[in-house]
Amino acid sequence: MPKLKTRKAAAKRFKATGTGKFLRRRAFRNHLLDHKTPKQKRHLATKAVVDRTDEERVTLMMPYA
């Protein structure tokens, strides 16, 4: 059986943890930041865990993660 290919777009966006979960960036932190409070921006700078409903899709895109 041939090797499975990793989806490079997913590899750039997600990072696997040691426990098998995936981390992702938060949305709403690219532009239009003037009206957001520093607390909001600090919170948006942190990583979030991919929801379990999306976990299977990410796993299929990154078979060796």
Curated annotation (Swiss-Prot):
GO MF terms, alphabetically ordered: structural constituent of ribosome
Sorted UniProt keywords: Ribonucleoprotein, Ribosomal protein
Kindly list the residue ranges recorded as spanning the membrane.
none
**Signal sequence residues:** none
Annotated PROSITE patterns: RIBOSOMAL_L35
Q: Which InterPro entries match?
A: Ribosomal_bL35, Ribosomal_bL35-like, Ribosomal_bL35_CS, Ribosomal_bL35_sf
Listed GO biological process terms: translation
Does the record carry Electron transport as a key word? no
According to the UniProt entry, the coiled-coil residues are none
Cellular component per GO? cytosolic large ribosomal subunit
The family line of this record is: Belongs to the bacterial ribosomal protein bL35 family.
Protein name as annotated = Large ribosomal subunit protein bL35
Gene it is expressed from: rpmI
